[in-house]
Amino acid sequence: MNRSNLVKRAIVRAAVLASFLVAAVPNAYAQEKVRPEVGKPLQAAQDLMRTNKFKDALAKVREADAVPAKTPYETYMIERMRASAATGAREGDTAIKAYEAVIASGKAPAADQLKIIEALATSYYNARDYPSAIKWGARYFKEGGSGGQIRTLMIQSQFQSGDFAASAKESLADIEADERAGRAPAEDKLLLLANSYLRQKNNSGYIATIEKLLNYYPKKSLWADIISRLQKKPGFSDRLALDVFRLQLATGNLTSTNDYMEMAQLALQAGNAAEGKKVIEEGFNNGALGKGAEADRHKRLRDLANKRIAEAEKTAAAELAEANAAKDGNALVRLGYSQATSGQAAKGVETIEAGIKKGGLKRPEDARLYLGLAYIHSGQKAKGISILKSIRGYEGGVGDIANLWVLFSQKSA
């Protein structure tokens, strides 16, 4: 949760707690006596707060405080009312001092104590005094509190005070507890964990958390982030450039003219003419291609794709025979994925499986990646996801690519 959102909630929460203190005042009057010269201005302050005239209410509290020779109980009631009025008037320092005085008096009923401590912790957070917010939040739990809002406030205070290791540890504990209970962790919790890892330069922790966010709350911007980081991962292979583009295209993150051109060219070079044509047509349809000084170049690439498709149709039988005659299954895998992306998904699955069975593959995990995607293209999503999940080889980044396709496929229609 970013600080501005939590502050808004904290301000509202502080106001609710302050109104509780006002509502509880009549009951407190019944316990011990308050002299009229103290009680009347306090009653007036209470009435003013009910109409949101908090600064006027503070003036009445000061009037009560000016009465000489106050009893400890009268002082307690004055500070209690001052805390409520100051909270409503957004006078944080005054509210904090008053709340601390109320707690220190020892006169607050046991039933009220936790709410007062919660209000104090919240007030410290609103004042950006994060160490004090953590201190009073800890006391809240020590005295038996169990409110999730205070725990969130404490973790956010750890983050804001620069203790990113602590905010990561506590956020992760909450998230894991939610998952064990079968609940989706709150998006705010996951974002806080991600930011805690990011501040520690813990890239693996950050990526793992973004993957959780994609699982529970998929967003285009998150996909853009994780795909970008994937390419920067040490050891990530350039051979997977086309696979990265495929993820960008699927998640709505292929946007620039250069990206459309490069992806189309890579697809054509890989022998996937139909895939290249699809990319080119999408680029023309959304305005990324066909405009500007390079418009003629874009049209020539489209013509080349159409030519390659026509050639592939003529040579399909011969190419399949040649792949079947090869000593290894590499050509069958390449041809099978080309079939899968050209509207022949079922045939593509069959061809890739034949290539895997033949063996001698240069990169077996790449072959399983394309088999999983081919199954998904064929409408057998569950089978495809199962295969993608089985990819354990991370040579060059293929396992990372497979994992992202699992996340995407699980959330797509």
Q: What is the role of each PLM region?
A:
Residues 2, 6, 11, 15-16, ...:
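N-terminal leader/linker segments that initiate helical-solenoid repeat arrays
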Residues 48, 82, 86, 124, ...:
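Residue at a conserved register position within TPR or TPR-like alpha-solenoid repeats
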Residues 61-62, 93-103, 130-141, 165-177, ...:
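Alpha-helical repeat scaffolds
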Residues 34-43, 72-79, 109-119, 144-153, ...:
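Generic helix N-cap/helix-start motif at coil->alpha-helix transitions
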Residues 89-154:
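Surface-exposed, polar helix/loop patches in the mature regions of secreted/periplasmic/lumenal proteins
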Residues 51, 89, 127, 161, ...:
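Structural motif corresponding to the intra-repeat A-B loop/turn of tetratricopeptide repeats
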Residues 327-413:
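C-terminal soluble interaction/assembly domains
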